[in-house]
Amino acid sequence: MHRTMAVTAVLVLSAAGAAHAWGGLFNRFSSDMLANLGYGRSPYRHYPYGQEPEEVYAEALEGNRLDDVIDEPGHCYSAPCTTNGDCCRGLLCLDTEDGGRCLPAFAGRKLGEICNRENQCDAGLVCEEVVPGEMHVCRPPTAGRKQYNEDCNSSSECDVTRGLCCIMQRRHRQKPRKSCGYFKEPLVCIGPVATDQIREFVQHTAGEKRIGVYRLH
């Protein structure tokens, strides 16, 4: 009797051990088995369980955890530039001692305030000398602004009332040069452009090229 019970106990323990071993082999969790629940090879397998990608994106925005955001194209503060279009939003290509640089749109100096450079004055104002060799102030452009195809360094030198701004001209087999030209978008210009001063209808002088003139809408 005791021998029979011992044999039975050994058989039970052996069966339990075998079952545990087979379970360890076949009862393993596979993420592919739950592909529709946020795991496995579904398109959203990289997102936390139970969250749609839109929810994760919103949380990342709130927590400022977007590490892989691609920087806005174009140059940024104080970077070299040729036209306004080369700069980030809110910056303009301004002429400096080191050439064109992306700088804040307007320095904000008002009419009559002392200035040192053209780009220190608000749009529509130019930095002009009032005491030779000593003092410059911001004032409206005087008569005699540069006309079509005349050399320039900044758009404030050109007659904006006729739709002109300072543009980098590139012609075949010629060295690039800055000159006053007609424009449709201020992005092609160099420096601040007072578009509110442009006359709606511009009369062309004889010999000027009839290219598209900027018009207010």
Curated annotation (Swiss-Prot):
Compartments in which it is found: Secreted
Tissue specificity as recorded in UniProt: ITG-like peptide: Expressed in corpora cardiaca (CC), corpora allata (CA), antennal lobe (AL) and gnathal ganglion (GNG) (at protein level). Expression in AL detected in all animals, expression in GNG detected in most animals and in CA and CC detected in few animals (at protein level).
Keywords: Cleavage on pair of basic residues, Neuropeptide, Secreted, Signal
Keyword Zinc-finger attached: no
Propeptide feature: residues: 22-208
Keyword set includes Plastid: no
Superkingdom field: Eukaryota
Gene Ontology BP annotations: neuropeptide signaling pathway
Name of protein: ITG-like peptide
Organism: Agrotis ipsilon (Black cutworm moth)
